[in-house]
């Protein structure tokens, strides 16, 4: 009888520990899933990902970007910047999408839409869930 009680306590403790581990992983992933991408002139950019808050990510991305930059935030997503290789200070495009492939394709499409001739991806970033 004593052995089965000890075994039951151990099983209960194991289940409790696994529940905490799974729940803790979910909390950490959600808590650190904000990012930002700053876009400037002539291919300048800044990126920040896996921050606890969008404002903190935006500030960090803008700090990395040279000159006047515009920041977009991403939460559980990816961002990409495409520039025209023939004219890096000319047409560019950026996108924020749930999947990296979609953001890369859309950024390139936007670059061509604004007159780019040889658009290439300059930079990309994803947060924890993107």
What are these regions (language model features)?
Residues 2-16, 24:
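Bacterial N-terminal signal peptides that target proteins for export
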């Amino acid at each position: 009888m004593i052995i089965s009680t000890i075994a039951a306590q151990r099983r209960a403790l194991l289940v409790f520990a696994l529940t905490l581990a799974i729940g803790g992983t979910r909390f950490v992933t959600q808590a650190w899933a904000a990012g930002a991408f700053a876009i400037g002139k002539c291919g300048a950019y800044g990126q920040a990902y896996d921050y606890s808050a969008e404002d903190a990510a935006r500030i960090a991305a803008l700090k990395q970007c040279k000159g006047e930059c515009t920041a977009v935030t991403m939460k559980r997503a990816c961002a990409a910047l495409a520039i025209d290789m023939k004219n890096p200070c000319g047409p560019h495009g950026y996108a924020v999408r749930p999947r990296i492939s979609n953001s890369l394709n859309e950024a390139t499409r936007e670059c061509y839409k604004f007159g780019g001739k040889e658009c290439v991806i300059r930079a990309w970033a994803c947060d924890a869930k993107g």
